[in-house]
């Protein structure tokens, strides 16, 4: 019993990775909703009981309206997506999908710009 409970986190990560791969294929090749354009699934977080999965995605557009439309399209199609996912996965509980726009890429770009500005300022101060 104790051995099984220790292996759950590793299994949870494997399940989340498999869900991420399958969702990417389903959304790219099977989903026909015009509100959902080209998106990238960046991460999937699954609860320990596999009841819920938080699906993080990025897209080319950073406009709030485009993001809102994409989230509503994914949410509206979540039943279909979950059904297709159920045909691919062999787990007892198929998680309910919650789609969230991933802002980590934009934050990373902003941080990179700040670092570049600080380095340029430091170089300018060194010249003076």
From Swiss-Prot:
Keywords: Cytoplasm, Ribosome biogenesis. GO terms for biological process: maturation of SSU-rRNA. The keyword Magnesium does not apply. Its main location: cytoplasm. GO terms for molecular function: ribosomal small subunit binding. Signal peptide: none annotated. Gene3D superfamilies: 3.30.300.20. One of its GO terms (cellular component) is cytosol. It is found in: Cytoplasm. The keyword Coiled coil does not apply. One of several proteins that assist in the late maturation steps of the functional core of the 30S ribosomal subunit. Associates with free 30S ribosomal subunits (but not with 30S subunits that are part of 70S ribosomes or polysomes). Required for efficient processing of 16S rRNA. May interact with the 5'-terminal helix region of 16S rRNA. Monomer. Binds 30S ribosomal subunits, but not 50S ribosomal subunits or 70S ribosomes. HAMAP family: RbfA. Belongs to the RbfA family. NCBIfam families: rbfA. This is Ribosome-binding factor A. The gene is rbfA.
């Amino acid at each position: 019993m104790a051995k099984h409970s220790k292996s759950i986190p590793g299994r949870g990560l494997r399940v989340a990775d498999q869900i991420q791969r399958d969702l990417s294929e389903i959304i790219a090749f099977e989903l026909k909703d015009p509100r959902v354009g080209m998106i990238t699934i960046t991460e999937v977080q699954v609860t320990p009981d596999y009841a819920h999965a938080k699906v993080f995605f990025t897209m080319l557009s950073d406009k709030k309206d485009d993001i809102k439309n994409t989230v509503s399209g994914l949410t509206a199609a979540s039943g279909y997506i979950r059904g297709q996912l159920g045909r691919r996965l062999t787990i007892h509980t198929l998680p309910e999908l919650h789609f969230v726009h991933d802002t980590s890429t934009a934050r990373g770009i902003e941080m990179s710009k700040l670092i570049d500005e600080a380095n340029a300022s430091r170089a300018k101060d060194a010249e003076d």
